[in-house]
Structures are given as C-alpha cells and as structure tokens.
From Swiss-Prot:
CDD domains the record matches: GT2_GlmU_N_bac, LbH_GlmU_C
Pfam families xrefs: Hexapep (PF00132), Hexapep_2 (PF14602), NTP_transf_3 (PF12804)
Keyword RNA-binding among UniProt keywords: no
Protein name according to UniProt: Bifunctional protein GlmU
Primary gene name: glmU
Region (Pyrophosphorylase), start-end ranges: 1-225
Binding site for acetyl-CoA: A375, A418, R435
C-alpha cells in the first residue's frame, strides 16, 4: 500500500504575499498542483495534503476525489509535527508513506519511482532523496556512515565544519509507515528553531538509505519570487524546446510563454512577445505575433495574427487578424476572413470571406458570407438590461460609421449608407439609410470669442 503526504501548511513568509505559497503558479499551474500531478503518476492508494496557513484557500485547490484527504496542522510547528498530526488523524499506518513538500514543482515522477524502488529493494525503514550543491545555503546537510544515513543537520543548527558538507536533504522521504508511527511522537523541538523536525527520525531508524540524484534542478524548492521565476524559466525552456524539435520557430523565445497544454503545428512561426495560454491549438503554417495573446482558442491553418488578443474563440483557416484586434469569448471567425486594426469582436459569428477592417465593434452578431463591414461600424447590442443580436445577410456592404441598434435583422445583399443609425430590419437587396439631409448655409460667420 502506498500513501502520500504533501506538506502544504507553511506561510511562505519570504514570498511576501497574501497568497499561500503553494498556490503561486508556474506556467498556469500552482506549485501544489504540480506536486500532486507527479504523485498521481505513482498510483497511490491515498494522498494526504497537510494544510495550515489559510487552510480553506489551499483546500479549494485540492482535487475533489476520494483519494484525497485534508489534514489541518495547527499550529505549524515543523515537518515532524505535521506527520505527528497525520499519524493521529489516520488510524491505520500500513505500507509505505511518501512525504514531500508542496513547493517542489519540478520533481519528476520517474525520480519518485526510483526512490520507491530503492526503498522496496532494501526493505528500508526510510529512504530519502539527496543531492550535492556547490553552495548549499539553506538546506539541511546529510551525513553518511557507509551506505546508510547517520544523521541530518538543518542549516541553522549546523556548525562551521558541518556547513562545508555539500550533500543536502531534498525533503523527499519514503518511510515504512508502521515503523515511523512507533517513533514519530518521540520527536522533540530541541533546536534553534524550536520546531519538530522530520529529519530527526533518521537517527532513530536503523535502515536509512539515500538516493542521490545528480540533476538537482528538479529538486528546487520555492521560497521566494526569485526561485519562482527560475522554475518558470526551466519549465518554459522545456516546453519551447519540445515545440522547436517538432518544427516550430521562435523568433525570440525568451520573450514568449507557452502553456503545457497548448498544441502548435509544424512550420508555425512565433514572433516576439507572444503568449499562448490554456488549451490553445495553433495549426500548421501560421504566423503568430509579435505582441499577441491567445488563450483557450483554436487557430486554423495558414493564419496570421499580429499585435492582437484572442480569448476562447474559433479562428478557422487562412485568416488575418490585427494589428490591435480583440477577439473576445465565443466568437467564430470563418475561413478567408479578415479582422483589421482596432476591431473588437464579441460572441459573434463571421461567415467565410467576411471583412471587418477598421475601428469597429461587433458584438452578439451573425455576419453573413462575403460581407464587408465599413470603418467605424458599431453594433449597439445592450439596452441597459440585456444584450440583443444583430444579423446581417451575405454579400452585404455596410457603410462607414453605421450604428445598428439591436435587435436588427438585415437580409442578403443589403447596403447601408455611411453614417446611418439603423433601427429597423431590411429585406434582401435593399438600401438602408438613416441620416438628415445636409444643409449648407452660405456666408456663415463663426462667433468670435
């Protein structure tokens, strides 16, 4: 039987944040979620998340699954105290207990599996991950005696000689839970921090093993915003390298960010300052950017999107968007259409070969095939209480500076006069015009101030 305990009770004081440390995000996922994802790969029987500081907030981030259990640690008196609380809450201490911190977002499932395999093969009381750091400031030092761990000394309790040891504790343990439960309550807070250390169990257990991991990048804990940024960079580099090996070009990859869920096709060019978030999909032969943000949207083949934002929308094939366009949620832009500069589209459908080239707002609308929307067109869709729809049939020509006061339904091949305010429906092949006749007053003199 395998149980997992994720330590997520700390305040994270050095983050200088009102948000619990484990809820800070890297590439769209919280630190806690990344640790959970790695643990789930092990197929454990149960996962305990030990919370404390702002427990209710942290609890909301835990999956709603019967495998997950919340254990509240009050007060937060150290890692050893956290496991003491867990052992009191859980009556059956069977099999293995994997313990790790909730702030190690880069830990690989494969490394955790290696630890479990070592533990099983040697029938250990405890096995833990260690690594060597050239400048190990802040980490507990691990001291070996032959093949076994003799003791672990926390940084603040080290003397000068002990601080020279470069073998550090990564904070990932696999215990024989039954044996651990017999000694856990003997731990005391006899140290400079006045906390109960889980590392003190090592000297009480006979068969304590070390799994030394060479790549200590994955063991990076997050204690401040600098380390958060470093981990973000590691993950982003990994994501972008994967896409580049699959045929994607980044013009300036350091200035771009890509979510792990995003899909990008071959021969896509990602220009500088482009950010692709959530479940976005960019199909082949597109040019995206520069200065473009796409989230939870599908972009078809051979599209060009520059200096624009696209949220939760469908962009079909051979479409040009931008510069400075804003495609808001629930919009669908059909193939061979064009959205030009300073255009906002919201909850609207544009059929094939439609054009909205300049300075327009299209909201809650259906625009027919091969329709041209003139500069400055506005769909006035909100009456102060609810939104209304505008429908414009195919092959229509909308004059510059037209305002549609929705609800409006225009037929096919309708033309509107420039500057019109359209308040009534129009039939097929009609001209809709609504403006006062121009009056010229000759010999007019402006009043002088």
């Amino acid at each position: 039987m395998l149980s997992v305990a994720i330590l997520a009770a700390g305040k994270g004081t050095r983050m200088e944040s009102s948000l619990p440390k484990v809820l800070h995000k890297i590439s769209g996922k919280s630190l806690l979620q990344r640790v959970i994802d790695s643990c789930v790969e092990l197929k454990p029987d149960q996962i305990f998340v030990i919370t404390g500081h702002k427990s209710k907030e942290v609890e909301k981030a835990i999956p709603n699954d019967k495998k997950f259990h919340v254990v509240v640690q009050e007060p937060q008196s150290g890692t050893g105290h956290a496991i003491q609380v867990l052992c009191r809450e859980v009556k059956k201490h069977q099999g293995k207990l994997l313990v790790l911190n909730g702030d190690v977002p880069l830990i690989r499932p494969s490394t955790l599996k290696r630890l479990l395999n070592l533990h099983d093969s040697k029938n250990a009381d405890v096995s833990l991950i260690t690594t060597k750091k050239t400048h190990p400031h802040g980490y507990g030092r691990v001291f070996l005696k032959g093949d076994f761990i003799e003791r672990i000394v926390e940084e603040k309790d080290c003397n000068d000689l002990e601080r020279e040891n470069e073998l550090i504790n990564a904070g990932v343990y696999c215990f024989n839970w039954g044996i651990l439960s017999e000694i856990i309550n003997t731990l005391q807070s006899n140290n400079n921090q006045k906390e109960i250390y889980l590392t003190d169990t090592i000297s009480l257990l006979k068969n304590s093993l070390s799994l030394e991991v060479e790549d200590n990048g994955e063991l990076q804990g997050i204690n401040n915003r600098i380390q958060l940024s470093e981990c973000e960079e590691i993950i982003q580099n990994s994501i972008k390298e994967k896409h580049m090996l699959n045929g994607v070009t980044f013009i300036n990859k350091a200035s771009c960010s890509i979510s792990e869920e995003a899909e990008i096709g071959k021969d896509v060019i990602i220009e500088a300052n482009t950010h692709i978030r959530g479940n976005a999909k960019i199909n082949s032969h597109c040019i995206i950017g520069p200065n473009t943000f796409i989230e939870n949207s599908n972009v078809g083949l051979n599209c060009e999107i520059s200096n624009s934002t696209v949220y939760a929308s469908q962009i079909m094939d051979y479409i040009k968007i931008g510069p400075y366009s804003h495609i808001r949620p629930n919009s669908e832009i059909s193939s061979f259409s064009k959205i030009g500069n300073f255009v906002e589209i919201k909850n609207s459908q544009l059929e094939e070969e439609s054009k909205v080239n300049h300075l327009s707002y299209i909201g809650d609308s259906i625009i027919g095939r091969s329709t041209n929307i003139g500069a400055g067109t506005i769909t006035a869709n909100f009456d102060g209480q609810k939104k209304h729809q505008t429908k414009i049939g195919k092959n229509s020509s909308i004059g510059a500076n037209t305002v549609f006061v929705a609800p409006i339904n225009l037929g096919e091949s309708v033309t509107t006069g420039a500057g019109s305010v359209i308040t009534k429906d129009s039939k097929d092949n009609s001209l809709a015009i609504s403006r006062t006749e121009q009056v010229n007053i000759e010999n007019w003199e402006r009043k002088k101030s």
